């Protein structure tokens, strides 16, 4: 039997490794910028073309590399960060595996120019698909200049699955923001297709946060600071009143490295318990400093999942420190006593003797005299107008089963004449049967949530909020497709401030927002003026509405225009729909039901939730047997 096991060529092995380390253009930028930080660079410039698909360039003024180091840096597991296994437990650098450059060179065309400060000439290396094409001396500034062209040029399947430019650029911006937030002492700049997106000078942490996410955040941040023998926790959390359902800026960093940690996220939310509505999120920027020996960063290729040795204790410290900050800055709501209707109590004058209290009594009262109301025999119960409780019910023909004329309850069993709903309603509305609204019926509202109405097969219950979402979704969807949305101008334009990562996504959906009725103008620097909103959304905050649609689009990451249009229509419908608890008149309920049954799919909301259900007449009869 011949041997079948053999070693893979380095180029193939590097491509396999690149599948874990390099997933998209943002991964390349993360690895190169982190290497620049490890090289003690003070200024880092990032330039991308076509969201990094065509070219990524990272320029730094760090230590640079010698000719030998420049060539060796592209070999697998070649690194200057560690020398032995024990160094893994004392890591202070961003990288340590020596895989990044080898992985990048395996799937792209790489050009490196680098020079250490001690040498007059630098080195230029060109590598494509792990093969060194040339290496020569060149004149260049101190530091390193990486140019990554045609990412995944030799793996068409990987390149085909890259997202649209707007999505990939959003991922680049998100990765860039994470690195910039954890290294405020370094100056960063980011350009996309020769357009400047970020220009961040070296500064303090709070100023860096405001430079990335806007100065409006300055009034919302509370500082957090605690130092123990186990961990040092610092950073900022937002005030409770800034909580939102989507779009909160939530960042954890440990020893200068970004991380995701759901367990510590629960600690933050525990500190805000009963301070923010359920389901809403709060912004925070939390920085941990711990002994490197007490954490393990080598459990995931992207190094964003980190294991702590004392997670439970740190959980308690984190939650307590945030609670302390909320109390110290008076962020916890205080008891507000309403003095509007309180009696005016005059100040006590010590010179005057206190007046005795006045007692009112009936001098003619005789407890032994019989009273006409005693004994309870003549007690009359308070009158209850039962007819008002059922005023909305019209009695018509009796039930099919006859009752005796002497039966006093026979007239309570009444039904309402039947009439077909509008022809626009589908023939198979529910369970394959034709739903028929009873003639002349007055719809009833139950608990401010459901609309009850009589149909041919029994009693129909309609969720008023979901029904309105169904109606509005179809309306807004048609407006977006036909670009016939009506815009209503606002007297004072609202200003929307966005970080660069969100602004890039907003630009990609701007046409769809205009189609539904929004009028936005770009003021530059991530600021947008909302000059007009869709008609019919009176009372809604246009800034929150645009943010909601923006963050939904970011979460979905859709590249198909129709799907983005559905997202916009659904978000707008949810925001504008009537809420639970809103009292509706009979005319409003009739209009809502008619519009619902005119929809192509009245049974379900666009996201698949049930809108209506029917209790069959036979099931109701069984309840009275």
Swiss-Prot record:
GO CC entries: mismatch repair complex
A GO molecular function assigned to this protein is: mismatched DNA binding
Checking Pfam families in the record gives:
DNA_mis_repair (PF01119), HATPase_c_3 (PF13589), MutL_C (PF08676)
**Entry-linked PROSITE patterns:** DNA_MISMATCH_REPAIR_1
GO BP terms in the entry:
mismatch repair
InterPro entries associated with the record: DNA_mismatch_repair_CS (IPR014762), DNA_mismatch_repair_MutL (IPR020667), DNA_mismatch_S5_2-like (IPR013507), HATPase_C_sf (IPR036890), MutL/Mlh/PMS (IPR002099), MutL/Mlh/Pms-like (IPR038973), MutL_C (IPR014790), MutL_C_dimsub (IPR042120)
Q: Which keywords label this protein? A: DNA damage, DNA repair
In terms of SMART domains, this protein maps to:
DNA_mis_repair, MutL_C
Q: What does this protein do?
A: This protein is involved in the repair of mismatches in DNA. It is required for dam-dependent methyl-directed DNA mismatch repair. May act as a 'molecular matchmaker', a protein that promotes the formation of a stable complex between two or more DNA-binding proteins in an ATP-dependent manner without itself being part of a final effector complex.
Q: Which HAMAP family match?
A: DNA_mis_repair (MF_00149)
PANTHER family, alphabetized? DNA MISMATCH REPAIR PROTEIN MLH, PMS, MUTL, DNA MISMATCH REPAIR PROTEIN MLH1
What family is this protein classified in? Belongs to the DNA mismatch repair MutL/HexB family.
- Entry protein name: DNA mismatch repair protein MutL
């Amino acid at each position: 039997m011949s041997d079948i096991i053999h070693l893979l060529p380095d180029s193939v092995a590097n491509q396999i490794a690149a599948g874990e380390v390099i997933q998209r253009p943002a991964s390349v930028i993360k690895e190169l910028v982190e290497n620049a930080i490890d090289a003690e660079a003070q200024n880092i410039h990032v330039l991308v073309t076509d969201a990094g698909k065509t070219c990524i360039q990272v320029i730094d003024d760090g230590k640079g590399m010698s000719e030998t180091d420049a060539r060796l840096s592209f070999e697998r597991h070649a690194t200057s960060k560690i020398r032995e296994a024990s160094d893994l437990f004392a890591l202070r650098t961003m990288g340590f595996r020596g895989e990044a450059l080898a992985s990048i060179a395996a799937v792209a065309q790489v050009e490196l120019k680098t020079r250490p400060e001690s040498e007059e000439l630098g080195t230029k290396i060109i590598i494509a698909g792990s093969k060194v094409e040339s290496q020569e001396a060149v004149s260049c500034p101190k530091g390193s200049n990486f140019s990554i062209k045609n990412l995944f040029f030799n793996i068409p399947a990987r390149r085909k699955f890259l997202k649209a430019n707007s999505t990939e650029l959003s991922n680049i911006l998100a990765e860039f923001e994470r690195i910039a937030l954890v290294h405020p002492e370094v100056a960063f700049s980011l350009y996309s297709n020769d357009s400047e997106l970020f220009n961040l000078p070296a500064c303090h942490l709070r100023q860096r946060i405001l430079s990335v996410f806007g100065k409006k955040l300055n009034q919302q941040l509370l500082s957090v600071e605690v130092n123990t023998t186990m961990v040092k926790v610092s950073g900022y959390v937002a005030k409770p009143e800034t909580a939102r359902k989507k779009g909160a800026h939530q960042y954890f960093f440990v020893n200068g490295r970004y991380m995701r940690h759901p367990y510590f996220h629960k600690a933050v939310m525990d500190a805000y318990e009963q301070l923010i509505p359920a389901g809403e999120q709060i912004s925070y920027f939390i920085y941990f400093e711990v002994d490197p020996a007490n954490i393990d960063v080598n459990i995931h290729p992207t190094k964003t999942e980190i294991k702590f040795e004392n997670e439970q204790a740190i959980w308690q410290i984190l939650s307590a420190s945030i609670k302390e900050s909320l109390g110290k800055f008076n962020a916890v709501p205080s008891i507000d006593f309403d003095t509007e209707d309180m009696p005016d109590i005059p100040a006590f004058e010590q010179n005057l003797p206190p007046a005795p209290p006045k007692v009112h009594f009936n001098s003619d009262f005789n407890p032994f005299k019989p009273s006409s109301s005693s004994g309870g025999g003549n007690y009359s119960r308070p009158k209850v107008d039962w007819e008002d409780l059922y005023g909305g019910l019209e009695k018509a023909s009796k039930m099919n089963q006859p009752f005796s004329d002497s039966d006093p309850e026979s007239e309570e069993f009444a039904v309402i004449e039947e009439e077909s709903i509008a022809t626009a309603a589908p023939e198979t509305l529910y369970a394959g049967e034709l739903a028929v609204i009873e003639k002349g019926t007055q719809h009833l509202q139950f608990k401010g949530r459901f609309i009850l109405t009589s149909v041919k097969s029994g009693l129909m219950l309609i969720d008023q909020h979901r029904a309105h979402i169904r109606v509005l979704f179809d309306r807004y969807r048609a407006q977006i497709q036909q670009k016939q949305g009506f815009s209503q101008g606002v007297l004072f334009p609202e200003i929307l401030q966005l970080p660069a990562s969100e602004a890039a996504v907003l630009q990609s959906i701007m046409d769809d927002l205009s189609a539904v009725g929004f009028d936005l103008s770009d003021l530059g620097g991530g600021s947008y003026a909302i000059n007009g909103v869709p008609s019919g959304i009176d009372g809604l905050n246009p800034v929150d509405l645009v943010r909601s649609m923006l963050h939904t689009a970011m979460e979905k990451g859709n590249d198909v225009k129709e799907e983005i249009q559905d997202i916009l229509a659904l978000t707008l419908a949810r925001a504008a729909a009537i809420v639970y608890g809103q009292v509706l008149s009979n005319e409003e309920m009739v209009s809502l039901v008619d519009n619902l049954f005119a929809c192509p799919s009245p049974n379900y909301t666009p996201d698949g939730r049930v809108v209506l259900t029917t209790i069959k007449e036979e099931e109701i009869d069984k309840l009275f047997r």
